[in-house]
Regions:
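A structural preference for short, pocket-lining loop segments at secondary-structure junctions
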Residues: 1-22, 32-48, 70-74
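Flexible loop/turn segments at secondary-structure boundaries
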Residues: 2-5, 33, 53-57, 76-77, ...
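Hydrophobic/aromatic residues within transmembrane alpha-helices
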Residues: 8, 60-61, 130-131
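Phosphate/diphosphate-binding loops
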Residues: 22-45, 55-59, 64, 106, ...
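Glycine-rich beta-to-alpha transition loops that act as phosphate-gripper elements at the mouths
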Residues: 46-54, 119-123
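CoA-thioester-processing core
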Residues: 55-109
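Long hydrophobic segments that form regular secondary structure
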Residues: 66, 119, 124-139
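Intrinsically disordered, low-complexity segments enriched in small/flexible residues
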Residues: 100-123, 127, 145-223
Length: 223
């Protein structure tokens, strides 16, 4: 059984074909606001993925207080494989998770490029151990060997953290803005030359790069 492989793309395809773009906007806004409320709840929330937790499925678990992941969990943001970018907070979460990592050393350009490659290449981790290395799981998250113990481990996380619990503050980090876009375009053009991606892949990469670079900003501005 899978946790979630993300949203039903047929829903979006049908509405795009019928030019019902307002319905798409409403769906995405509701999804984003629901996950924001989940992340900022006044009590701890634990997700217990098993099997696939990718795309929108990963965006859900990434915004819970704690994750108790079964050992066979596969985690990642794979939207680029179908010509999309994560739209439920996944980009923000990966920036948050990598911002203070020792590999990044508080370098806004390194941060943007790291997450750009991670999401752009649709990187997945096929175990919780690998997921921690990619920051899909954090230090406070746990791996559970038996599915039968997922709820038990979730209960432990809740009861051991319910006293004086405080939800995460809003994500905040510095991003380089347009200064990193040329490097991102070099990556995209190389992939196009190798026939790994086509014109649409370039457009998807540009949108992803604009988002992860911070757009019209610079590294002296805290977002």
């Amino acid at each position: 059984m899978q946790f979630s492989a993300g949203v039903n793309l047929n829903y979006f395809y049908d509405r795009a074909v019928n030019k019902e773009f307002k319905d798409i906007d409403i769906f995405l806004n509701n999804f984003q606001q629901s996950l924001y409320q989940l992340q900022h709840a006044k009590f701890p929330v634990v997700s217990c993925p098993s099997g696939l937790a990718i795309g929108g499925g990963y965006e859900v678990i990434s915004q819970t207080s704690f994750i108790a992941a079964h050992s066979n969990s596969v985690l990642g943001l794979v939207e680029s494989l179908v010509g999309l970018i994560p739209a439920g907070g996944g980009c923000k979460e990966m920036l948050r998770r990598w911002a203070n990592h020792s590999d990044i050393k508080n370098d806004p350009k390194l941060l943007s490029l790291k997450v750009f490659n991670l999401i752009g290449y649709a990187t997945t981790a096929d175990s919780p151990i690998k997921a921690k290395a990619q920051q899909f799981l954090g230090d406070k998250d746990v791996m559970v060997m038996s599915k039968d113990r997922l709820i038990e481990e979730a209960d432990k996380l809740i009861f051991s953290n319910k006293e004086n619990y405080h939800p995460l503050d809003n994500a905040s980090f510095s991003l380089p803005g347009s200064t990193v876009m040329s490097e991102m375009m070099d990556i995209l053009n190389e992939l196009k030359d190798k026939k790994v991606i086509g014109e649409h892949g370039i457009e998807v990469g540009k949108k992803l790069g604009y988002m992860l670079s911070g757009g019209d900003t610079n590294s002296s501005t805290r977002l």
